[in-house]
Structure formats: C-alpha cells, structure tokens
C-alpha cells in the first residue's frame, strides 16, 4: 500500500463555464480544497479512514453551497428531509439515516446507528429520537433553509417538475445531482465511505434516494474499493451502482478505472441515469468519473497539494499514485 488518500464530491450535473462567474468558481474550489486539506491532515496524523470521511462529509453538510445539511433543498411540502450513510471497509459495518429533519449533521447520526445500535438504517422520528438520546442536539429545520433553495422550489412548482437539485445560475440545476460524499484510504490500509444529501427539490415527502442505501450510493470494502455516488438516485438504486464497482473488480477482475468506465459510462446511461462517483481502491488509486458536464470534486494524497475540479477535464477522471 502507498500513501493515504482522500477524495470528496459535491454533486454532479450540467455545469457550464458560461453560467458560472470566476467568483462563484472560486467559492466552490476554496470550499472543496479546505475540506480535502482537513482530511489530508487527519490522515497524516494517523486517523482512521472512517473518521476522515465522517468529518469531511460533516464539513460538506455545514457548507450551504451543497445540497446536504445546511443548504438542503425543499420537499413539495416546504420541509427538509435529509439522508446519510457511512460504511467501514475494514469491518463492513454500516449505518444510515433517512428522512430526518431535526439533526444538523445526518452523517453523525448515521455513524451513531453504525456504532451504537444493532441496526444498519433508521428513518424519520425514530432515527432522530435515537440520536437525541445519544447526545445529538435537536435543531429547527429552518437552519437548513436558504433563500436560494426556496426560490428553486417555487421555480420547480411553476414548471410542475421534480428536479434533482435547484434551478438557476450558476448551473442548469434541473440536471444537477445534489449529494455530497467522501472516500478515504488510511495509513493502516483501511477504506471508508460516506454520503449525505438533502434529496430532490420538490420531491414527495418520504422519498428516499440512493445516498443512504448501502451498495447503491455508498459502499466500502477493504478487499476492493470505497465508493460514494451522486446522480439520479432511483437509477443508482436499481443499478446498485456503488456495489457494482466492487463486484466488477472482485469477480470480473477489472481495474478501478475499467469498473468505473463500465458503470458510469455504460450501465447507468443505459438505464437513463446520469451523475458520477468518487472511488478509491485498496491500492490507493483514485477515480472520479462522471457522465454529466461536470462534478464538484477534490482529492489528494496525504502530504500533497489537493487537486480540485468542476468541469470535465481531459485525463482527470483517474489518478494513480
């Protein structure tokens, strides 16, 4: 095994240079870089991949630029319903929450489910009460709200549409997938993954996508790979996208790059799915494939300068240490 490494994403979609100002680009790049740098420092200090991805996603949830935690989109009923998942590649233990509205950081609740319950997934009020009983603060759902997200809900209603994230500059938001995630390989050779989302603008209350589902939007196994997905959740569920990467590597003998190409560029589009994913294999190779115009992403080996990206760049989808 080589050096420890982390990768994060903040959603994929029809991201156009023409629609985004330099100032807007810099806001995203600075946020992504800072979060990856935090993860790199944690890895250098010998912290576990599980702790690193949990903290990275918590920071993404705290950033209103992304559709997770603060800045989450609205449901049709003008509420917020958040989902998250974490998975430890060393033990294959996982935890997830779905449809929570009063927990500031759903990824921390998912971690509690994994470590302090016999379950893998908990939903709604039961998940919230479980987290409250273990020290998490109850917050008003209003903390997740932003004026931009509300404007996007109104626009979606006007169009009679359910959209994957928000509408309006700087993106063609009807095609933007609002999810955040992190994957990491630590100095002990352990992999971990975490994913969190606010879901779809104008979604029906109770809808759950791929993000909190082990094997669909989040997966980690030390024998192969850690994966976090972003895209059309219903299709990622049907395709078991995250696990399919691992299966193609384990049973098909494909490399990380080959498995990602097969899933993201062939299998998902065949089902009408768009989006992308981030993945790190057990050897420390990194892949960041997407079949949309862009994906907010960043990655870096411990001790190196982070690499960030928004748009499609030639040769940037796979990195080998």
UniProtKB/Swiss-Prot annotation:
Changing residue 179 to A: Catalytically inactive. The keyword Hydrolase applies. Keywords: Autocatalytic cleavage, Hydrolase, Protease. It comes from the Bacteria. It catalyses: Cleavage of a beta-linked Asp residue from the N-terminus of a polypeptide. One of its GO terms (molecular function) is hydrolase activity. Induction: Repressed by cysteine, an effect that is attributed to CysB. The record marks 178-179 as: Cleavage. The keyword Hydrolase applies. Its EC number is 3.4.19.5. SUPFAM superfamilies: N-terminal nucleophile aminohydrolases (Ntn hydrolases). CDD domains: Asparaginase_2. The active site is at residue 179. It holds the Pfam family Asparaginase_2. Substrate binds at residues 207-210, 230-233. GO terms for biological process: protein autoprocessing. Autocleaved. Generates the alpha and beta subunits. The N-terminal residue of the beta subunit is thought to be responsible for the nucleophile hydrolase activity. It is an enzyme of class 3 (hydrolase). Heterotetramer of two alpha and two beta chains arranged as a dimer of alpha/beta heterodimers. This is Isoaspartyl peptidase. It comes from Escherichia coli (strain K12). The gene is iaaA.
């Amino acid at each position: 095994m080589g050096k420890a490494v982390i990768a994060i994403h903040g959603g994929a979609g029809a991201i156009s240079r023409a629609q985004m100002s330099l100032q807007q680009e810099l806001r995203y790049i600075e946020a992504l870089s800072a979060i990856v740098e935090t993860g790199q420092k944690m890895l250098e200090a010998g912290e576990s991949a599980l702790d690193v991805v949990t903290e990275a996603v918590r920071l993404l949830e705290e950033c209103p630029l992304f559709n997770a935690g603060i800045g989450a989109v609205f449901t049709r009923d003008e509420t917020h319903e958040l989902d998250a998942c974490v998975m430890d590649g060393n033990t294959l233990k996982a935890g997830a929450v779905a449809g929570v509205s009063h927990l500031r950081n759903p990824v921390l609740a998912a971690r509690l489910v994994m470590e302090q319950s016999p379950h893998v997934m908990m939903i709604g009020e039961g998940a919230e009460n479980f987290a409250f009983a273990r020290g998490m603060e109850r917050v008003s759902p209003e903390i997740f709200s932003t004026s931009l997200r509300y404007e996007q809900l109104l626009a979606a209603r006007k169009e009679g549409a359910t959209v994957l994230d928000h509408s309006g500059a700087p993106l063609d938001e009807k095609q933007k997938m609002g999810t955040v995630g992190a994957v990491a390989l630590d100095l002990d050779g352990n992999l971990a993954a975490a994913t969190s989302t606010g879901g779809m603008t104008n979604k029906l209350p109770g809808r759950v996508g791929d993000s909190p589902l082990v094997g669909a939007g989040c997966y980690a196994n030390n024998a192969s790979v850690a994966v976090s997905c972003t895209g059309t959740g219903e299709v990622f569920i049907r395709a078991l996208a995250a696990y399919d990467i691992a299966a193609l590597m384990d049973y098909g003998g494909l490399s990380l790059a080959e498995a990602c190409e097969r899933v993201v560029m062939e299998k998902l589009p065949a089902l009408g799915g768009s989006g992308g994913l981030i993945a790190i294999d057990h050897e420390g190779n990194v892949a960041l494939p997407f079949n949309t115009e862009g994906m907010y992403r960043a990655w870096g080996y411990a001790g190196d300068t982070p690499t960030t990206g928004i748009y499609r760049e030639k040769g940037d989808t796979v990195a080998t240490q």
